C-alpha cells in the first residue's frame, strides 16, 4: 500500500519512456477519487484544513506571499469519521476512525467550505471543527456543528484523526515524490485517501 513515484514504476516495469507511465498513474488516481466520491461521510465527523507543499514557479517565489495562500502551499479540507468509545472498566474515552475525505480548496472562503461540506458529509452528521470564521455556516448543512478553540488539546483529541491524516499524507508525499505541482495535488490526495480508506482490506 506504499506509494510509488512514476519514475520508480517505470524502472520496475523496465519501460523506456516516462510519459506513458505518468499518464497511466494519474488516470488511476483519478479513478480512485471518482470511486470515493460515490459516498458521503456520516456519523461524527472531524473537519479541519491542512497546508501542503507544492512546486512553485520562479515568478510566484519572487512575489513571496506569506500566511494563507502562501507561495508553495495549497490548502486542503480533511474530513474523518470519528466515533468516541469509552472503556467500560476505566471510563477512559478514545476516538476510533473509519473513512476519510480530502479536497483541495482554491480559497479559504465560507462559500467553498459550505460546498465541500454539502458534497462530502451527510446532513444527519455531527461535525467537530475549530472556530474558524470560514465555518460559520456549517450548522446549516449538518445536524449539529460543535466548535472548539484551536489549541494543542483540540489537535490531539477533538480533531485527532484529521491531524494524523494530514501528517501522514505530508510524510508520504515527501518520501515518495520529489515535487508535486499544485494542479495535480488532488490526484495525489485521491490515492492517499483511497488507500487509507482500505487499510484493513
Regions inferred by a protein language model and the residue ranges of each:
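Residue-level recognition of single "structural anchor" positions
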Residues: 1-201
Amino acid at each position: 500500500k506504499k506509494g510509488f513515484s512514476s519514475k520508480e514504476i517505470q524502472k520496475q516495469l523496465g519501460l523506456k519512456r516516462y510519459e506513458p507511465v505518468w499518464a497511466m498513474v494519474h488516470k488511476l488516481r483519478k479513478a480512485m477519487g471518482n470511486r470515493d466520491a460515490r459516498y458521503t461521510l456520516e456519523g461524527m465527523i472531524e473537519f479541519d484544513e491542512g497546508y501542503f507543499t507544492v512546486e512553485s514557479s520562479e515568478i510566484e517565489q519572487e512575489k513571496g506571499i506569506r500566511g494563507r495562500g502562501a507561495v508553495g502551499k495549497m490548502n486542503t479540507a480533511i474530513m474523518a469519521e470519528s466515533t468516541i468509545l469509552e472503556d467500560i472498566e476505566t471510563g477512559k474515552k478514545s476516538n476510533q476512525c473509519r473513512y476519510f475525505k480530502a479536497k483541495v480548496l482554491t480559497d479559504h472562503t465560507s462559500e467553498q467550505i459550505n460546498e465541500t461540506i454539502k458534497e462530502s458529509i451527510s446532513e444527519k452528521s455531527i461535525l467537530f471543527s475549530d472556530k474558524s470564521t470560514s465555518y460559520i455556516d456549517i450548522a446549516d448543512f449538518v445536524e449539529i456543528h460543535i466548535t472548539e478553540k484551536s489549541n494543542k488539546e483540540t489537535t490531539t483529541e477533538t480533531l485527532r484523526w484529521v491531524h494524523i491524516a494530514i501528517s501522514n499524507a505530508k510524510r508520504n508525499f515527501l518520501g515518495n515524490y520529489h515535487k508535486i505541482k499544485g494542479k495535480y495535488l488532488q490526484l495525489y490526495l485521491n490515492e492517499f485517501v483511497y488507500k487509507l480508506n482500505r487499510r484493513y482490506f
